[in-house]
């Protein structure tokens, strides 16, 4: 009986130590996020550069999908939710449709999506950058207009991906200053 109690204590202490080590690992990756963010944004911009001309040439609409109200949400108290929803929107709605424009485009859009997933994963690990619950009306509007535009919505959303990267940068800069 005495040895089983000792074994339980050892298992508990090992779990506490492992949890503390994982927390420290997560904290240390969060410490490096502000310095690695410019590199991640450069990678996103470079990956987008490979499809930018294609989608901007196909975008025949003269209005913006990613409006000032979305940027205002990124800068305001809904910044976290707006960023999270927009990443999800691009990954689940825009990019799967954008991949349907030939094998070269698919390869580059897929690469862009992987870089966006990596950014999302790093932000989620650092809860101070993505700790959100509320919905953004600006994102809902982007999604509604995107749906209304049908195929043209893909061209519009992809042609404005650089604006989205700028909004990510604005959000992250605001968060790092706090």
UniProtKB/Swiss-Prot annotation:
GO molecular function terms noted in the UniProt entry:
cytokine activity
The residues that the database entry marks as glycosylated are 134
A Pfam family the protein falls into:
IL10
Q: Where is the protein localized?
A: Secreted
Question: Which superkingdom, per the lineage?
Answer: Eukaryota
UniProt entry keywords in alphabetical sequence: Cytokine, Disulfide bond, Glycoprotein, Secreted, Signal
Please give a single GO biological process term from the UniProt record: negative regulation of inflammatory response
Mind naming one GO cellular-component term on file for this protein? extracellular space
User: Is Secreted tagged as a keyword?
Assistant: yes
According to the UniProt entry, the coiled-coil residues are none
Q: Which cysteines are joined by disulfide bonds?
A: 30-126, 80-132
Which InterPro entries does its entry note?
4_helix_cytokine-like_core (IPR009079), IL-10 (IPR000098), IL-10/19/20/24/26 (IPR020443), IL-10_CS (IPR020423)
Where is the signal peptide, in residue numbers?
Answer: 1-18
Keyword Secreted annotated:
yes
Q: What does this protein do?
A: Major immune regulatory cytokine that acts on many cells of the immune system where it has profound anti-inflammatory functions, limiting excessive tissue disruption caused by inflammation. Mechanistically, IL10 binds to its heterotetrameric receptor comprising IL10RA and IL10RB leading to JAK1 and STAT2-mediated phosphorylation of STAT3. In turn, STAT3 translocates to the nucleus where it drives expression of anti-inflammatory mediators.
Could you describe the subunit structure of this protein?
Answer: Homodimer. Interacts with IL10RA and IL10RB.
What family does this chain come from, according to its entry? Belongs to the IL-10 family.
PANTHER family assigned: INTERLEUKIN-10, INTERLEUKIN-19-RELATED
The protein in question is named Interleukin-10
> What does the organism's lineage look like at the top?
Eukaryota, Metazoa, Chordata, Craniata, Vertebrata
């Amino acid at each position: 009986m005495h040895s089983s109690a000792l074994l339980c204590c050892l298992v508990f202490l090992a779990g506490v130590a492992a949890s503390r080590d994982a927390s420290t690992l997560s904290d240390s990756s969060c410490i490096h996020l502000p310095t690695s963010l410019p590199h991640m944004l450069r990678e996103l911009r470079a990956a987008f550069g490979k499809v930018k001309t294609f989608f901007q040439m196909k975008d025949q609409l003269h209005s913006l999908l990613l409006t000032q109200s979305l940027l205002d949400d990124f800068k305001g108290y809904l910044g976290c939710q707006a960023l999270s929803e927009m990443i999800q929107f691009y990954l689940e709605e825009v990019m799967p449709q954008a991949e349907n424009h030939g094998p070269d485009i698919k390869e580059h859009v897929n690469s862009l999506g992987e870089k966006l997933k990596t950014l999302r994963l790093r932000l989620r690990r650092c809860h101070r950058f993505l700790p959100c619950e509320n919905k953004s009306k600006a994102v809902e509007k982007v999604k509604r207009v995107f749906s209304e535009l049908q195929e043209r919505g893909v061209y519009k959303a992809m042609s404005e991906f650089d604006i989205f990267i700028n909004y990510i940068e604005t959000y992250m800069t605001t968060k790092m200053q706090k």
